[in-house]
Amino acid sequence: MDRHGVCAALMAGDNEAVAGAQRAHPGRIFGEYHASPTDIMRAVRELEHYVRDCGFVALRIEPFLWRKAPTDRAYYALYAKAAELDVAFQAQVGHTGPLFPSETGRPTYIDEVALDFPELRIVCGHIGWPWTEEMIAVAWKHKNVWIDTSAHVPRHYPPAFVHFLRTFGKDKVCFATDYPLLRWDRVLPEVDALELDPDVKRRFLHDNAARAFKLAS
């Protein structure tokens, strides 16, 4: 991180391993609670534990693993708890890399969740591709919705997304890599090649994520 000027990073995976990494690197690594679809009420209790006791900053759900769209009632207790705890909800949005049906990743489902939970900060991964313009519309509509760029290299961002990032969406896009899938030494030079205005670049690389996840770094 230091070598590439990265001041903070979000981490998800095995929850105990993430908690250990956050303890080892306070103020640099911020954990996300990765919810399992097998026991909802256990997940609700674990979310509270990892936020209150371990300092996690987000609930992370990958709907394709649950085989349920984000609007399914199975998630709503978790959304309510995340809103109560004032942590973000980070969702996999867009097609799935693994061989699962992609329908659960349609951005339009996030529209309904944002309406039902206006206090819940929602960060949508993978630029919503291939439904990126649909994702842009949802993020623009809702003040509590952001888009992140995980798993997408800047040179392949769709033109509509780059325009959104540069202009009316400059407060709505959070830089992400999906590390180690994409590494900073590959992606950050491509961010430089976008030649963003300094103010836009600062928001993209830092300010928007700091606001969406309420990071102190």
Question: Which stretches of residues belong to each language-model region?
Answer:
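N-terminal cationic-hydrophobic initiation segments that often serve targeting/anchoring roles
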Residues: M1, Q22-P26, V51, A114, ...
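Conserved, mostly hydrophobic/aromatic
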Residues: M1, V18, Y50, A82, ...
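Alpha-helical scaffold segments that flank or form the walls of functional sites
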Residues: M1-A12, E48
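Mid-to-C-terminal alpha-helical segments outside catalytic/metal-binding sites
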Residues: M1-H4, V162, G169-C174, L181-S217
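Short active-site oxyanion
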Residues: G5-A9, F30, R121-I122, V173
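Active-site gating/metal-coordination segments in enzymes
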Residues: D14-T104, R155, S217
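Short, well-ordered alpha-helical microsegments
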Residues: N15-A19, I40-A43, I110, W131-M135, ...
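Catalytic pocket-lining loop regions of alpha/beta-barrel enzymes
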Residues: V57-A58, K68-C174
